[in-house]
Each structure stands twice: as structure tokens, then as C-alpha cells.
Amino acid sequence: MLSKTSIVILGLLCKGEKNAYDMLKMIDSMNMKYWLPIGATTLYETCLRLQKKAFIEDSGESQAKAIYRITDKGKQELKNTVIALFNQVDYDTVWFCLAVMYSDILNKEELNTAKQKRAALLDEYEKGTKQNRDIMLQHKVPYSAICAIERMIRIVEMEKETLSKL
């Protein structure tokens, strides 16, 4: 599976060719720094790694700087990663955000299948999490021990709402 930075780069390149500086400007304009900080060095190094894996290539349009474009292999890897992210529940909610942001790489059938699988996972996860919370409440466990579980229930509810609107 791709790293978070790789997902962002490939997702941005799905929209068209860009150099690293333009990608950094786009990331900044999306206010990603608050939930997924990507510095210049990380972006440049990740571009080089993606190029070595043949997920992106230099278009050769500029002598002064690399202008990257996504390859078919890169599109397929991004698609596989987005599908994999829909099929897992993670405490790190950035993964789901990235899956949603770049879900337009999926065709309608792939997206619907991914959404259905995600919804089933969330239903199962929510049920188990609520049962755990209820047991803790029955045993009069202090709220400080329950608050993380409450947070996860809210996250599941928000993700379900997101899926319904996607």
C-alpha cells in the first residue's frame, strides 16, 4: 500500500501534470498542513521513489525542472490503495480522508462496492465498540477511560455520513 504522501502526489497528478513546487502550493492551498504535513524534502524524495517504481514519470517538457505525470501503473496502484483503505478501519482517520479525496479514481461500480464493504465494516466496528462502552458503563468505569471509545463512535458515525454523501 502507498504511503500517505504517495497517495497525495498520485492523486494530484491524476488531475494533470505538475512539478513538485506546484504540488506543494496545491497542498498548502488545501490546508493539508493541519492534518497531513508534507514538507518540500518529503515531497521531493517521495517523487523520486515513485519515479523509481514507475508510478510517475518526468514528462520531459522542461529542461529546468521535472514536470511529473502519473503512469498507468501509478493509476492502478492508487486505485488499489484507495480500495484497500475503504476496506479497513483505522484509528488514524487521515487514511479514510485520503481514500475519500481520491475516490474519483474509481469507476462507479468500484466505488459502490468499496462503500458497501466500508459500511459493513463500520457497522460491525460500531456494534462492538458500543458493546464495549456499555460494559464499561455498567461497571462504572470513570469517563476518562471511556472518552476514547466515545470518540471512535463519533468517528464511525461521521464516516457513515460521509459514505452516504459520497
Each model region followed by its residue ranges:
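Amphipathic, well-ordered alpha-helical segments in soluble domains
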Residues: 19, 23, 46, 125-129, ...
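Acidic interhelical loop/turn segments
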Residues: 130-148
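Amphipathic alpha-helical dimerization/coiled-coil segments
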Residues: 81-127
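Positions in alpha-helical segments
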Residues: 7-11, 98-101, 147
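Heptad-repeat amphipathic alpha-helical coiled-coil interaction surface used
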Residues: 112, 119, 123-126, 133, ...
